[in-house]
Amino acid sequence: MKRILAIILSGVAAIWSAAPSFAQQDTSSAQQDTVRILGVGNSWTRDSMRWLSAIAASAGRPVIVGHAYLGGSTLEQQYHGIDDPSYTYKHRNIDQVVHNTYQYWKYSGTDNPVKTPAEGYKNGLAGIGVTLESVVKDEPWNIVVFQPHVIVKAHMPDYCGFDINHLVSRIKEMMEPEVAKSVRCGIMIPFSYPEGNTDYRQNVVDAYNGGIRPSIQDEWDQLYETMHCEIQKDAIKLSEHMGENCSFVINVGQAIYDTRKDRHLSGFGYKLQRAQNNTHLSEGIPMYIASLCYAYILLGITPDDISFYPRLSRDAHLTGDTGKTIQTDIVNTKSDAARARQCAWKALSLHDHQ
């Protein structure tokens, strides 16, 4: 299995090394220009882009970061809802309209958003929100990052019957011609969970030492390795299928997979995976690691360039036999942040092919 994983990772590295990036260009002028980055996906896009603007600002790179997300959706569902105001999908067992229920968050050099959904937004379930087209037209975006849906059982859904290139083309049609001509598109591979494990930690967050129980850790790690191997195959398959529409791959799943094995960092939310609702990254160090991946891949930023880090991480765990979930704020230290930056950098292996 380890040999197979190494082969697959080398394939991903080849994709990155072949793809154009800010890191491989003359950045003397790029550093003076504002880079506008838009994420399109579900709430895992929100998680992963949470700290990108603040990270870039601390490295002296002016950016505008926006993410338009539709909770619990796939890119296929978003594509169908662009031009069909009546198209719905199931979200939390409720039929939700796609067309005008996007949440749009926007950041510009700060760790707090400069634009948020309107008060009373209710996550779009009340039919309150914005269209994807309005977000695309809000800025002359330089980069658009698409986030394929990754299901808990390990795989992206087979894109048979839906071609992600259709969504890329449709979004370019919304842009001014000169913007569409120069925009760079690519994909972000999210983190996922292993399947086939009876360990209840797959469904809830616990408070064991860094989430590790040695008696079953070998089984847990083997399941993660199997699952992650499949995600790497999916990443290669999808990027090759997108062809020229995929100029980069941001493998957040790779970074989370690798750093979850760090006994120190794994204390920030179980294995860096989940916050209170057992689905999302915790807002502090875990989201920071995900945002670092964007900064490294898209902006050519290195760990030594960055001074910003979130001051708190929110850890969720169960109490006693009641199963009640409580949250505890953990104070992050400079050494925590430095460790996170190095772990994310090492996981992406950027030093091998920049």
Say what each PLM segment does.
Residues 125-283, 305:
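Alpha-helical cap/lid subdomain in secreted, periplasmic
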Residues 2-10:
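Sec-dependent signal peptide recognition
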Residues 46-161:
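Conserved SGNH/GDSL esterase-like catalytic core that processes O-acyl groups on lipids
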Residues 265-354:
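Conserved catalytic region of serine esterases and O-acyltransferases that act on ester linkages
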Residues 14-22:
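C-terminal segment of classical bacterial N-terminal signal peptides
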Residues 57, 172, 176, 295-303:
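Hydrophobic/aromatic-lined pockets within catalytic cores
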Residues 31-32, 136-140, 178-180, 288-289, ...:
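Extracellular/periplasmic catalytic domains that process cell-envelope and extracellular macromolecules
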Residues 24-60, 65, 352:
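N-terminal module-boundary/linker segments of secreted carbohydrate-active enzymes
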